[in-house]
Amino acid sequence: KSLIVVPNHITEQWAAEWLQLYPAANILVATERDFEKRNRRRLCARIATGDYDATIIGHSQLMKIPLSRERQQAILQRQIDEVLLAISDAKRQKAENFTIKQMERTRKSLEARLEKLNDQSTKDDTVTFEELGIDRLFIDESHSFKNLFLMTKMRNVGGIAQTEAQKSSDLFAKCQYLDELTDSHGVIFATGTPISNSMVELYTVQRYLQYQTLQEMGLIHFDDWASDYGETVTAIELSPEGSGYRPKTRFAKFFNLPELMATFKMVADVQTADMLKLPVPKANFHTEVIHPSELQKKAVAGLAERAERVRARVVDPSTDNMLRITNDGRKLALDMRLLSSLAPDDENSKVSVCARNVYRIWAESTAQRST
């Protein structure tokens, strides 16, 4: 029984194209209304008892079908045990106090989640994922689930995010359940960008799809995986606020790539643009050099001051942070009006220059009805 999980906005498109390919197929397509509290049990009952060739749901809807309480407890307890082992190992190796404190925070967070789950006073009559009878899980655009928490002793290394998205943790738990059920043959990922920002994302994909293999190889912990396949490199980069340059360490140099790719290709069918030979029109690129206005220069200087305050930790992260500063930098680079509605309409901003070019090309090609 297959469950197809796709981005929310294309569930109906997937259904239409599925029926175009397989007109006689019996498929079930879930809508947002189906996952409202009063309708969810009815939908889950249809999935569990129906003989469908496929059930198609959206990314956000997958979390609304939880694993059983007992399985969630077992998974959380296993994660807590792994953290305790890592803390013990870090203390034995006399790791930095910051690293150990970070691991302790992780342990407390997991224990709080386990305690909340153990609260039997919470009535739970939700149909669980196991009760649906799903034995094949297909995830389209799987890179949307890349924020899976990892533990590492590395500090201040770019490309190694230790933030966790709840939807990623939920999918990881379901992947482990299906691994047990199908001997690691029940999960399929599809994406055009398995690695978008950092090679750490390859490790994340392997945790989803090759958890048992990593365990057998002794590479289940990121630091072990990283020591086998890569190293950190420090280089001079433009600062996020654009006010100057600074040294930045990244997990960016790799070795033993043949061995890494051989392991990865045990579960991956890689198709590049050259292999697919898709009909792609030739692009003619034109570079437009846009000079900043005085107002933009002042705004960039303000970003630099904000960044210094963030680095010095004199501002609350909920008030200002590097992500917000970078986002403001992108906005002001396009048009100052994105930052302030009171800013003047600059005819030499990126947006204005782009609009003039689009109109000019449209006017010149009107006779051919070009787009």
List each language-model region with its residue ranges.
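Short, intrinsically disordered, charge-balanced linker/junction segments flanking boundaries
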Residues: K1, T366-T371
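Glycine-rich, phosphate-binding/catalytic loops in enzymes
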Residues: Q20-Y22, R71-I75, K153-A161, T204-Y208
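Inter-lobe coupling linker of SF2 helicases/translocases
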Residues: R40-A86, R92, F98, R105-R136, ...
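Motif I (Walker A/P-loop) of helicase-class P-loop NTPases
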Residues: K1, L171, Y203
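Short, solvent-exposed beta-strand-terminating loops
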Residues: H143-F149
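Conserved Walker A/P-loop ATP-binding site and its immediately adjacent core
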Residues: S2-I27, D34, S60-K64, P194-E201
